[in-house]
UniProtKB/Swiss-Prot annotation:
HAMAP family: Ribosomal_uS8_B. The keyword Ion transport does not apply. One of the primary rRNA binding proteins, it binds directly to 16S rRNA central domain where it helps coordinate assembly of the platform of the 30S subunit. This is Small ribosomal subunit protein uS8. It comes from Trichodesmium erythraeum (strain IMS101). NCBIfam families: PRK00136.1. The gene is rpsH. It comes from the Bacteria.
């Protein structure tokens, strides 16, 4: 099934896989999903990710992380903020702090996809894609 909003599709697949305690999940590979996966990996929310397939059928295989004996998912909350029907833009002064700095907001800026902390440090704003903690 083709998804019009690849970011929401990616976040939903990760959220569902975490709740089912799967070790991996597959998401369609686009520049945007690769960038978001890189930010999640750099922030320690997911393990590795690798690209699989050729041509149109490219997928990212994302390795999920858990903690403790009960395998609690590292990602406890994953929410899409800016949607195709209602885009949410914030300037550098309005960038949100998620849970007082414990979580992250993933921002799409003119300099690429980054966390809210990095965007604040560079002094740039952009589209708030999602919140993660």
């Amino acid at each position: 099934m083709a998804a019009n909003d690849t970011i929401s599709d990616m976040l939903t697949r990760i959220r569902n896989s975490c709740m089912a305690q799967h070790t991996t999940t597959k998401v369609p590979a686009t520049k945007m999903t690769r960038s978001i996966a890189k930010v999640l990996k750099d922030e320690g929310f997911i393990g590795e990710f690798e690209q699989e397939g050729e041509g149109i059928k490219k997928y990212l295989v994302i390795f999920l992380k858990y903690k403790g004996k009960n395998r609690q998912p590292i990602i406890r909350y994953l929410k899409r903020v800016s949607k195709p029907g209602l885009r949410v833009y914030k300037n550098r002064k309005e960038l949100p702090r998620v849970l007082g700095g414990i979580g992250i907001a993933i921002i799409s800026t003119s300099s690429g996809i980054m966390t809210d902390r990095e965007a604040r440090k560079r002094g740039i704003g952009g589209e708030v894609l999602c919140y993660v903690w």
